[in-house]
Every structure is written in structure tokens, then in C-alpha cells.
Amino acid sequence: MRVASVLLAAGGGTRYRASLDAAKSGVPKTHKLLAVGADGRSVVEHAFAAMAAGSGDGPLIVVSGAVELPELPNATQLHNPKWAEGQSTSLWTAIDLAVRLNCEAVVVGLGDQPRIAPGDWTALRNAMTLGASIGVATYDGRRRNPVGLARSVWPLLPSNSDEGARSVMRAHPSLVTEVPCTGNSDDIDSVEDLLQWHLS
């Protein structure tokens, strides 16, 4: 089964920018996806590395929007000019490519979640291979990312909202398979989040 791994990294980082403007910590004023960790790699590079390590031999797709991303090895990098219209536009940018690549499912994560583990990506990929319609990672019982979407549910996805797959999961709970994961799904939404990530 051909499963594409997708990293959505197109948002404007509005909450982080507000936090950055208010901070007095000397943190460089850059987009959160480009903020650098203790090892010199950016937030999005960490998120991508985990995805790549946990994705087997499937295609790697990265969708950018508000900011130009660094080159990411072995990835097809797409720009979504409609990124400001909501996360679903970025998801559809990736799915359009997945259709052309004859993929039967996608596993989708976010570029501002650098602590998701490679094993979490693998677990979602395995769930899709075993026939899940929608797979969702859970951390201590909470549904978070990554999320797996079989080709059969793609027509149900919204085209221009910020909900991604959440509305489909609410409308079709019987299609959802929860996949327990062990990483950390916290995102970087503030300077405090960034500094905490530096310490983790």
C-alpha cells in the first residue's frame, strides 16, 4: 500500500508572532518554523526529520505558505498560495499530489510539532496499511497529530477551512481508529514553548 507522509508548514504563526513581540528574552525575531533549536536545526527541520525517519519508503510531501522553508532532503516541497484561507487548502495541495502519485492514504502532521517521534509516524502508517479509514494519534488519551486519511475519505474533507480532518472525524466517528503514540505532540505557539523545547 502506497502511503504518503505529509508535513503542513504553511501557516503564518500569528500567536507566536504576538508572543515574540511581547517577549524580552532576546529570541531572534523569525517565523516559528525557522526558529533554531539547541542543535542548530530549525523547528520544521526537526519535524521533518521525524517524519522522514518514520515513513518507510513512501513519498514525503511538505507544504509551505507564509514563509520559504529550507530545502528538506528527499521531499517534494509544494507552495500553497492560498494558505491564508485555512489549513484545508494546504491539505488539499498535498492530496492533489498524492492522487497523482497513486497513493492510497496520507499521514499528515504539522511543521510546528518538533517533538513527535518517528515511531508515531510509523504507527499511523501501519494503521493505514492495515485498513484504517481515519487514523488519529493519541497521547495519554488525547487525539492529536499525526492523522492518517485513506483515499476513501478524501472526498469528505473540507476545501477551505482551518479544521483539516477534524470535522470529518466528528461527522463520521465510526471511521476513526485511535493509535496510541509515545512522543510529544506539543506545538510551538509562543516564545515560552520555544524555550521549553530548547530544554527538552
Where are these regions (language model features)?
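Short, polar loop motifs at secondary-structure junctions
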Residues: V63-L69, P173
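SAM-dependent methyltransferases
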Residues: M1-V6, Y16-R17, A53, N74, ...
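N-terminal glycine-rich phosphate-binding loop and ensuing alpha1 helix
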Residues: M1-S64
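Short, conserved active-site loop motifs that form the nucleotide-linked donor/cofactor pocket
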Residues: A75-T76, V176
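Conserved beta-loop-beta/alpha segment of the NTase-like Rossmann-fold superfamily
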Residues: T76, A84-R151, P155-L157
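Residues at secondary-structure transition points
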Residues: S25-A38, S42, L78-T89, R115, ...
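Short beta-strand segments
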Residues: L8-A10, V63, G109-G111, A137-D140, ...
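Conserved alpha/beta core of the MobA/IspD/sugar-nucleotide pyrophosphorylase nucleotidyltransferase superfamily
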Residues: M1, S5, P155, N160-S200
